[in-house]
């Protein structure tokens, strides 16, 4: 787990990178990860915009969880996915890459050599204070991301 904070205007951004234990890990190891992550979140200033990315070894499924996931999650929800959703609910976090449909080539970050298993990097996007940086509407979500990128990179070719 690693965290970095970018100070900027009109807001600061904290990025947290997490790699969760595999499904073979002891429950105590998984709980230790979530406890450490909770401690790190509590150290994050409330006004920061928070991006959390990582390999959670979790499938959140395609059933929408209001305020947390959209209908474009991967696979059938597993135990790790349920734990992840609970953590997000407790901390007002949104699993952003479940909110809108993506091109097939962007669904997976890893596929097993036999093609039977695929892993998707799960990303979050949320304001710690719960302000509305989240929208169920794809166009609103894209607009918010574009506004943030414009603020962060005012002199880039992206604008």
What are these regions (language model features)?
Residues 1-159:
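A shared catalytic/ligand-binding motif for oxyanion handling
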């Amino acid at each position: 787990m690693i965290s970095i904070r970018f100070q900027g205007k009109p807001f600061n951004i904290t990025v947290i990178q997490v790699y969760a234990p595999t499904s073979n890990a002891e429950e105590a190891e998984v709980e230790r990860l979530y406890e450490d992550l909770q401690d790190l979140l509590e150290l994050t200033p409330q006004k920061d915009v928070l991006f959390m990315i990582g390999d959670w070894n979790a499938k959140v499924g395609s059933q929408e969880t209001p305020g947390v996931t959209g209908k474009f999650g991967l696979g059938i929800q597993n135990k790790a996915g349920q734990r992840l959703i609970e953590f997000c609910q407790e901390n007002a976090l949104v699993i952003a890459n479940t909110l809108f449909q993506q091109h097939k080539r962007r669904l997976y970050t890893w596929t097993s050599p036999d093609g039977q298993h695929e892993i998707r990097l799960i990303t979050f996007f949320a304001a710690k204070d719960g302000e509305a940086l989240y929208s169920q509407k794809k166009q609103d979500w894209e607009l918010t991301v574009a506004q943030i990128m414009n603020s962060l990179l005012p002199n880039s070719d992206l604008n």
